Amino acid sequence: MQKLIIHGGKPLKGIINISGAKNAVLPIMAASILTDKLHITNVPKLTDVSTMKELLKSHGAGIEIIEHENEFELVINAANINNLTADYEIVRKMRASIWVLGPLLSRYGKAKVSLPGGCAIGARQVDLHIAVLKAMGAEITIEDGYINASTAGRLKGTHFIFDKISVGATINAVLAAVLADGETLLFNCAREPEIVDLCNCLNKMGADISGIGTSEIRINGKDSLSEASYRVLPDRIEAGTYMFAAAITKGDLKLYGIDYHIIENIALKLIETGIKVMPIDNGVQVTYADKLNAVNLETNPYPGFATDLQAQFMSLMTISQGSSIITENIFENRFMHVPELCRMGADITVRGNQAIVQGVKGLKGAEVMASDLRASVSLILAGLSTDSETVLHRIYHLDRGFQNLEKKLNNCGADIKRV
């Protein structure tokens, strides 16, 4: 099994180009089921993207891959879907597989989707997905680990209030409603930029969606959608990770291809710690200043601080001056990186959904193990901050969400080897 060997102590300096957003491209790929052909550009080279390609092919879609040095183009032809079952062997690899449920049901009136897998960071149940589809008239049962959904005729437009904000359920609801009969009003929706990107793509395909980027989305269902081309937005989680990498290594990085407004909440939190963050043309520059202050953090739905950056921020706080409290409000069991950081000398105490981080003078290299995608990159950041060697095991998580991470960091002065 592969591992990373990280020799830290080197300030990162240089330029990093941000890849397309994983959390946008996956639902957009699922949206291809709603039309005959969809051309997607700025697609990142990730194992999760490969898994979604495998899933779409299993349904009968044809996929043309146009490979460039730093991205893919995908041309997905879903005119001949012939299998409405999303099999466990594929779905277990990635929770985003659940997003084929809404499109299959809406276009074909039937779907059978295995209960999903992915990172082990909490229950993340599908109850809200099922509830909103039932509100549209679907008949749904769960048997033998599969969601069985069907509808007599088209799904019906509905008014639905999400009991809690859910990115995944908002996505499935939108994907189902665009071909439903009548108007759908969704309340208490997630507002993430990746949902905005999905809605913009669907509108380019001929959907009628308004309220995009707000908590109230209005969808007038269409009889069909048309072919379209769409470029995926840049990955704010990747950008935030490299912003923290500049800070934790006392470096100076310029990140290009990212819109500052979608990372502004990250920038403001870094500025609060004493790091210098400046918008530049088509990107952002992050520069270490004189010190790193400890600050508190709470994860919340967008526009709050992203849970997908919590672990990386915690790594930064382990070497800050003072004590910080990090509160995880989105997922339970998302502090699995804490014991590994403590192996490197961090001083962290977990109490429920809070982690109290007492900054130390510096971390020490150690052998550590990644439990999930975001934990893996947080341990890389920690390793980069040390003046010794860190060995990271179970790095298969990393390739699910970060394209060419070692190459991008090594080009800026890091010393990371995959063996």
UniProtKB/Swiss-Prot annotation:
Catalytic activity: phosphoenolpyruvate + UDP-N-acetyl-alpha-D-glucosamine = UDP-N-acetyl-3-O-(1-carboxyvinyl)-alpha-D-glucosamine + phosphate
Record: residues binding UDP-N-acetyl-alpha-D-glucosamine: R95, D308, I330
Cellular compartments annotated: Cytoplasm
Pathway: Cell wall biogenesis; peptidoglycan biosynthesis
GO term, biological process aspect, one: UDP-N-acetylgalactosamine biosynthetic process
Record-level GO cellular component terms: cytoplasm
Binding site for phosphoenolpyruvate: K22, N23
Domain of life per record: Bacteria
Function: Cell wall formation. Adds enolpyruvyl to UDP-N-acetylglucosamine.
Family: Belongs to the EPSP synthase family. MurA subfamily.
PANTHER family according to UniProt: UDP-N-ACETYLGLUCOSAMINE 1-CARBOXYVINYLTRANSFERASE
Protein name (database record): UDP-N-acetylglucosamine 1-carboxyvinyltransferase
Gene, per the UniProt record: murA
